[in-house]
Design a protein with these regions (language model features):
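Short, surface-exposed "cap/lid" segments of acyl-processing enzymes
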Residues: 21, 25-28, 32-109
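Alpha/beta-hydrolase-fold enzymes
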Residues: 1-9, 136-137, 154-272
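Conserved alpha/beta-hydrolase "nucleophile elbow" surrounding the catalytic nucleophile
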Residues: 142-148, 319
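Conserved acidic catalytic loop of the alpha/beta-hydrolase fold
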Residues: 108-112, 122-139, 151-156
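Catalytic histidine-centered segment of alpha/beta-hydrolase-like enzymes
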Residues: 348-366
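Conserved alpha/beta-hydrolase "acid-adjacent" motif
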Residues: 323-329
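N-terminal targeting or regulatory segments adjacent to alpha/beta-hydrolase or S9 domains
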Residues: 1-31, 63, 395-397
Length: 397
């Protein structure tokens, strides 16, 4: 038993982890089993807009589903796949129509598809918001960690142009103002020069991948950084897994496997996007200083002005024990969005929660989700959502 456990542990420590599946075949809504089918509605070179379409034979439940708010969840592009938010998606599906940004592994994107910049990220988000609005007549946006910054930029630019805005924004555990309560992640970016990152962590994709020759920040480096933040915790977890295998505790061992199958699956990021994020967010603090310019899809240079946002609810969420995005970093969005009335802004600190606890696990489901759901519903029911352009029939879209 001990020998078998040793082989199993060594295999898992050395294996190559592939992109996980969301694996949400159905959810229970009001006692009815609602089937889920993943559909790619917008296919971009570096990201798919994934829609979790719902299907149900129960007429009453179907009517309920049709009336639910449509939410675009913007997943982080910071090393892990969007499936890291599996629990977020599964919970949100109980009361919302759910879309998510499914970011692609840059090593699989051919050079012929061009580069990917932080500006492109912002433009992608705007395109996805418009798509959801065109489909449902409205959109709510929820961003988790890294994307809080480009999402705020995207909505700010839409506001400055006078576009139809999302009805609400929920921003969770993100570095809106990385100068507040700096964490180890912030300090690394602030204490190293831009050229250090360019010269030490950027590599070209090997020839055996579709993206051969592309400059990337490799996922394995990001994963090493994740583990280095809490080495004792990961070491103990692997040792506990080894003991569970010896004892024959298959349930605990399987929980370990599921977590690390997700945690160890990482993607490469395009070098331009990664380096520009380091400079813009963690070194120059352009968002909070009001000096961030974005090149639009049409080639125009536009200044990011969060103060131009007015007709949009804003909820910020922080974990009390978050060691990635420090206290006050996400809450800073409330001050930046000075054009939003105080009555439409709210902040929630999750007691006892670390970074991952605000979007996954018991605290997310029992503490955070009720706050998010109530905020979205409050701004959904009070707004006059435009009617969908396409008729909704057997599917809830």
């Amino acid at each position: 038993q001990r020998l078998s456990a040793s082989y199993d542990l060594m295999y898992r420590l050395g294996k190559d982890y592939v992109k996980p599946e969301f694996g949400i075949p159905f959810v229970d809504i009001n006692g009815s089993e609602v089937a889920i089918r993943e559909v790619i509605e917008v296919n971009k070179p570096f990201c798919d807009l994934l829609h979790f379409k719902t299907f149900c034979d129960n007429a009453a439940t179907l009517e309920t589903l049709k009336a639910l708010p449509a939410v675009l969840i913007v997943a982080p592009l910071s090393g892990h796949y969007a499936t890291l938010l599996r629990d977020t998606v599964k919970t949100m599906l109980q009361g919302h129509k759910v879309y998510i940004t499914d970011w692609k592994n840059a090593r699989l994107v051919p050079l012929s598809d061009g580069e990917f910049h932080l500006d492109d990220y912002v433009n992608y988000i705007q395109e996805f918001i418009r798509h959801v609005q065109a489909t449902h007549g409205h959109c709510h946006v929820m961003s988790v960690c890294q994307p809080t910054v480009p999402v705020l930029a995207a909505v700010s630019l839409m506001a400055s142009r006078g576009e139809h805005l999302p009805l609400s924004m929920t921003m969770m555990g993100g570095p809106i103002d990385a100068t507040k309560s700096p964490t180890a992640v912030n300090n690394l970016a602030m204490n190293k020069s831009f050229s250090w990152f360019e010269n030490n962590v950027i590599y070209r994709v090997p020839t055996n991948f579709p993206g051969a020759g592309r400059r990337v920040y490799p996922g394995f480096l990001q994963h090493t950084g994740f583990v280095a933040m809490n080495p004792d915790r990961h070491l103990k977890s692997h040792y506990d897994y080894f003991k569970d295998l010896i004892k024959g505790d298959n349930s605990s061992a399987e929980s370990h496997r599921q977590f690390y199958d997700e945690y160890n699956a990482v993607l490469d990021m395009d070098a331009d996007y990664y380096l520009e994020t380091i400079a813009t967010v963690f070194q120059d603090f352009k968002l909070v200083k009001g000096t961030w310019d974005v090149v639009s899809e049409s080639g125009d240079i536009e200044r990011v002005r969060p103060q131009d946002i007015s007709h949009c609810g804003l909820l910020t969420v922080e974990g009390e024990l978050d060691d990635i995005s420090g206290s006050g970093q996400t809450k800073a969005a409330l001050k930046l969005c000075s054009g939003i009335p105080a009555s439409n802004k709210s902040h929630y600190e999750v007691k006892g929660a670390g970074h991952y606890g605000i979007f996954s696990g018991r605290r997310w489901r029992d503490m955070v989700y009720p706050q998010v759901q109530a905020f979205i519903l409050a701004h959904h029911s009070s707004a006059k959502a435009r009617k969908p352009k396409r008729r909704v029939s057997a599917s809830t879209r």
